[in-house]
Each structure stands twice: as structure tokens, then as C-alpha cells.
Amino acid sequence: MSQQENKKMINVGVIGAGGRMGRMLIEAIQDNPQTALNAAIERQGSSLVGADAGEVAAIGRLEVQIVDDLKAVINDIDVLIDFSLPAATEQNMQVCAKHNVAMVIGTTGFNEQQEQVLAKASEQVAIVYAGNYSTGVNLSLKLLGMAAKAFGTDADVEIIEAHHKHKIDAPSGTAYMMAEAVAEARGQNLKEVVVYGREGQTGAREAGTIGIHAIRGGEIIGDHTVMFIADGEVVEITHRARARMTFAAGAVRAATWIVQQPVGQYNMQDVLGLNDYI
């Protein structure tokens, strides 16, 4: 590769490089002609520290050594991709904001304080924050908004999500995104109308509420179905993920996009240009 071509490469760092998603991200970065892996980070105490990131991802040696300190490599990257845990991502946002490094965040389960850290960081650097990076899911969000506007509160809305038995949070970030899309289209505050599962003597279903139900089992990558249940008809919008590479490739696509954007917080629909449509 010529020196001129090399200047065009986007240097990417990956948090959780040895995890399932991290390994997929490394492969996706190498598959994308615009990006190069330049930093791979694992938690302190990980047995993978010191290993070659490419060998860990089973794609061949990349000469990128896994480290346990983001600060040690922060100046080597243009953008950081973080699919980890809320507490870790909170710290990483502060480091990136201090060093003017863009971020792509796929971590879910933030509390209010961590959301405030995200908002503050996005005042200093450009950040893509999404619960799901697949094109199909983000297209589904647009369709959900259309359906919610058409039905209004005349239809009862129930969301059912299913994931593998290893997932540690529920409901999924994608389920929240779908519920938020419906609530926003209906002019509702999601926190005021959401119902998480049902048990016991719940009484009659309250009109306008949005139900969310979580299933965990096996190795399901991610299934989401939103039901609009009206008198005399039911409309279902379903997305099923069949390969994690879908999410990884989408996150890398977001990384190539965010480095060209001004400071601010964006979502995957911004990346895909879907916000240009009704």
C-alpha cells in the first residue's frame, strides 16, 4: 500500500478484543478497505493481554498486541468501538473525550448517570450510540414508527425479544429502541407507558401501554417481534439476526462515518441516512 493510500485508512481501536463480539469486530475491520485495527484492549488481568489480536480473532497475525490500558493506545486511533459493559464504557467515554477520539458504542444497559456521561462526552467528540447496528433492525424502526402513527393507541403493542442464554441484561437494547420508536410516534413518554412482562392478578390491560417480554435460551443471536393488536387484525414486524457479523460490519460502517462528522451524538439511522425519510 502506498503512503498516500495509507493516509486514508481509519485507525480503529476495539474494546473487549478477546470476546465474541470483539473478535467479530476485528475481522470486520480487516474486511473493510477503509479501516485498519490499530489497538485492541482487554480488561486488566485477562490472559489475552500480550497476545496478537489477529491470532485471537483467528484471522492471522496482525502485529497488534492486546493491551489492558486504553490510555496507552488512545493516541494511535481515530475511533474506538466499544461493545462492553456500562461501567467500562463510562470510563472509556471520558478517556476518548479527553483525547478527542470518536466513538461507536454498542454497550447497552446504561443507568441515568452513565447516560449523563454519554451526553457530556458527545459535547466534546462525535459518538454513534445505538442498541443495534444492523441495517435490518434500523429499517424496522422506521416501519414501526409508520405503523404506530397509523394505528395510534387503537392497537395494543407487545414486544417479544429472544436472545442466547449468555446475555446478562434484559430486555435488550434493541427492544428498548423498538418501544421508544412506537412511543415517540404516538407522542408518548415510554417510561410512563412501558410494562415489563406480566404475572399474577394484573387486571385488564391498560390502553396505550407497551408491553416488553424477554426470552433467554440456547444460542439465539437476536429475535425481535413487535405486535400491533387491533380489533379484527394483527400486524407483526419481525427481525431475526442470523449472524453476528451483521452487527460487527454495521459498527465498522458507523466508524467510517463518524470520523467525518462534527461533535455530537448520533444513532445508526443517522449513519444509514434513514432520518432523511418520513
Curated annotation (Swiss-Prot):
It is an enzyme of class 1 (oxidoreductase). (S)-2,3,4,5-tetrahydrodipicolinate binds at residues 164, 173-174. NAD(+) binds at residues 16-21, 42, 106-108, 130-133. Pathway: Amino-acid biosynthesis; L-lysine biosynthesis via DAP pathway; (S)-tetrahydrodipicolinate from L-aspartate: step 4/4. Its EC number is 1.17.1.8. It is found in: Cytoplasm. GO terms for molecular function: 4-hydroxy-tetrahydrodipicolinate reductase; NAD binding; NADP binding; oxidoreductase activity, acting on CH or CH2 groups, NAD or NADP as acceptor. InterPro entries: DapB_C (IPR022663), DapB_N (IPR000846), DapB_N_CS (IPR022664), DHDPR_bac (IPR023940), NAD(P)-bd_dom_sf (IPR036291). It holds the Pfam family DapB_C. It catalyses: (S)-2,3,4,5-tetrahydrodipicolinate + NAD(+) + H2O = (2S,4S)-4-hydroxy-2,3,4,5-tetrahydrodipicolinate + NADH + H(+); (S)-2,3,4,5-tetrahydrodipicolinate + NADP(+) + H2O = (2S,4S)-4-hydroxy-2,3,4,5-tetrahydrodipicolinate + NADPH + H(+). Coiled coil: none annotated. NADP(+) binds at residue 43. One of its GO terms (cellular component) is cytosol. Keywords: Amino-acid biosynthesis, Cytoplasm, Diaminopimelate biosynthesis, Lysine biosynthesis, NAD, NADP, Oxidoreductase. GO terms for biological process: diaminopimelate biosynthetic process; lysine biosynthetic process via diaminopimelate. The active site is at residues 163, 167. Belongs to the DapB family. Catalyzes the conversion of 4-hydroxy-tetrahydrodipicolinate (HTPA) to tetrahydrodipicolinate. PANTHER family: 4-HYDROXY-TETRAHYDRODIPICOLINATE REDUCTASE 1, CHLOROPLASTIC-RELATED, DIHYDRODIPICOLINATE REDUCTASE. This is 4-hydroxy-tetrahydrodipicolinate reductase. It comes from Psychrobacter arcticus (strain DSM 17307 / VKM B-2377 / 273-4). The lineage of its organism: Bacteria, Pseudomonadati, Pseudomonadota, Gammaproteobacteria, Moraxellales.
